[in-house]
Amino acid sequence: MSKILIVEDNEKNMKLVRDLLQYKGHQTLEAITGMDGVRQAIDHVPDLILMDIQLPDISGIQALALIREQDALRSVPVLAVSASVMPEEQQKIVTSGFDAFIAKPINIKQFIDSVQSFLTSGRKKA
């Protein structure tokens, strides 16, 4: 069973992602702010992190930078989950160090496939 941290401030989005992952047999951890996500990642060292970009305290990009400072978390894949559909925003997100971008609203099949791919293969770039 994989341990996946979901960092998402929207209750409906959190529930959808949590329910999908738990249905697929994964253990989930939850955080609703960027700093809480960083703390949870440090405390629990998940197998995968799903990070919203727009969070109430710090951005997902800022949270990712703090996560990547931790030696134990450098190999953990972090996937950005965002409603931003502008190509330049998506490019900024990916060049910030995220391993992949998942657009909201979530396409369930693509979402599950992406999660499974990263759980199987790990980070594509270290």
Q: Which positions does each model-derived feature cover?
A:
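Conserved acidic carboxylate
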Residues: 8
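Two-component/phosphorelay signaling modules centered on CheY-like receiver
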Residues: 11-29, 96
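Short hydrophobic/Thr-rich beta-strand motif most characteristic of the beta2 strand and flanking loop
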Residues: 25-32, 40, 102
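Active-site residues of response regulator receiver
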Residues: 52, 82
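The feature encodes the CheY-like receiver
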Residues: 56, 65, 74, 86
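C-terminal output helix
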Residues: 106-116
